[in-house]
Amino acid sequence: MQDVIFFDQRPRPDRDQTPRERRYYVWTVGCQMNISDSERLEAALQGVGYSPATRPEDASFIVLNSCSVRASAEERILGKLGELVRVKRQHPDTRIVLWGCMVGPNNRSIFADQLPMVDHFVSPSAVDEVVALAPNPIYTLDEPALPVRDWSHPPVSVHVPIQYGCNMTCSYCVIPLRRGRERSRPLAEIVEEVRRIVARGAKEITLLGQIVDSWGHDLPGRPELADLLEAVDPTPGLLRLRFLTSHPAWMTDRLIETVARLPRCQPEINLPVQAGSDRVLKLMRRGYTVARYKTLIARIRAAIPDISLTTDIIVGHPGETEDDFRQTMDLCAEIGFDKVHIAAFSARPGTRAAEQEQDPALAVPPAVKEERRRRLEQLQEQIATERMARFLGQTVEVLVEGESKGKWRGRTPGNRLVFFSHPADLTGQLVPVKITATSPWSLQGVPQLDDSVNAQSKENGLVKAR
């Protein structure tokens, strides 16, 4: 997964009269997989009769969905649990659940001693198990909950997990220890879930997995991600289809060809390289070389010339020298990624890299990690500035996601953020936008729409005052 995100829910105003005993509070830290899990949980809780609360003290059922990718994420959760001690003291009947990647198979007993305010510890993605702990349900679910918590305003884009767990043994990653081995959801189940989501108003689907390219290898018949894309692409009403996160060892020519051919598959691939040094890649146990990665990038660009390539990089992994880091800088400059998610190495208990960091000869000082992170960010900002400048004067297709600070916000097929002004509510529509200004991180433009759009918007009552 990519960035660590902190996500909180907001209540539906039409349910303000729900008593405290049927209110929940969900607080989520982590990647898009965690956010999707929490959305599905909230939908399920609402389905059994609960409503969201804006504050934990207003809820009888509190769930913290945790992340272990970096120490800072765990610190956020522990800090939140510290705040909940007061809530538990005021309302002893409050039920608190610690959910997600902090809860592994071997640490529940440890947490039970360290975190007495927590009533239950639940492993990642186990939505049904969490729902079963809610103390005051009044309904039962007729069908599986979808990963959308509020259908009163259907989201334009929805992430759909297709796989849980990970079989890789990357030196720095704790996810396999917490989420377990890979488990692929059946193709028919995913296709039906996508159909239900799109039928209710979503326009874009992102298929989600820790190593999304490996989906299906554990299912009967060993289907591939390309097969799933073929099955999802024709969904009526679907405008765009994406997937993440990929792994260089699992990216196949067939998958590349499928992305290039299918009309709704977007020209974007997130392909984490993690380092530009073969020596560091070996320490990381990534399973490929820099040369192999470059060859793969060349094949992708040959098949999909307008591809948007993003990647993840860790700086300061134990054993990384200044020369190793310079090789990473050189790789970024050579490939020219559209976006790079950069993280300084954070030792996670139980991983091989955490053991390596105990060796003074391998450990990279925190100040050096931070300095390398800043240097790489500066380089990537220069690269992104140049790559985004190519769009100046071009007209791009934008799927409008919503409003932000008085402008409409949307994304191009390559997932580049675009802002523009228009009096009509264009949410969920594909809009041609001529780019008039660029920055490293977003584009500004003018919609290329005829007067009939404005007239139709007025007729439908969609024009907003600005």
Curated annotation (Swiss-Prot):
Functional note: Catalyzes the methylthiolation of N6-(dimethylallyl)adenosine (i(6)A), leading to the formation of 2-methylthio-N6-(dimethylallyl)adenosine (ms(2)i(6)A) at position 37 in tRNAs that read codons beginning with uridine.
- Cofactor(s) needed: [4Fe-4S] cluster
Give the family this protein belongs to, as stated in its UniProt record: Belongs to the methylthiotransferase family. MiaB subfamily.
Q: How is the cofactor bound?
A: Binds 2 [4Fe-4S] clusters. One cluster is coordinated with 3 cysteines and an exchangeable S-adenosyl-L-methionine.
> Per the UniProt record, which EC number(s) apply here?
2.8.4.3
**Keyword flag Kinase:** no
**Molecular function (Gene Ontology), one example:** 4 iron, 4 sulfur cluster binding
Q: What is the lineage of its organism?
A: Bacteria, Bacillati, Chloroflexota, Chloroflexia, Chloroflexales
Where it sits in the cell: the answer is: Cytoplasm
Q: Where does [4Fe-4S] cluster 2 bind?
A: 166, 170, 173
Instruction: Show the catalytic activity.
Output: N(6)-dimethylallyladenosine(37) in tRNA + (sulfur carrier)-SH + AH2 + 2 S-adenosyl-L-methionine = 2-methylsulfanyl-N(6)-dimethylallyladenosine(37) in tRNA + (sulfur carrier)-H + 5'-deoxyadenosine + L-methionine + A + S-adenosyl-L-homocysteine + 2 H(+)
Q: What Pfam families would the database entry show?
A: Radical_SAM, TRAM, UPF0004
Q: Which gene encodes it?
A: miaB
What residues does the TRAM domain cover?
A: 389-449
**What is the protein's given name?**
tRNA-2-methylthio-N(6)-dimethylallyladenosine synthase
Q: What is its main location?
A: cytoplasm
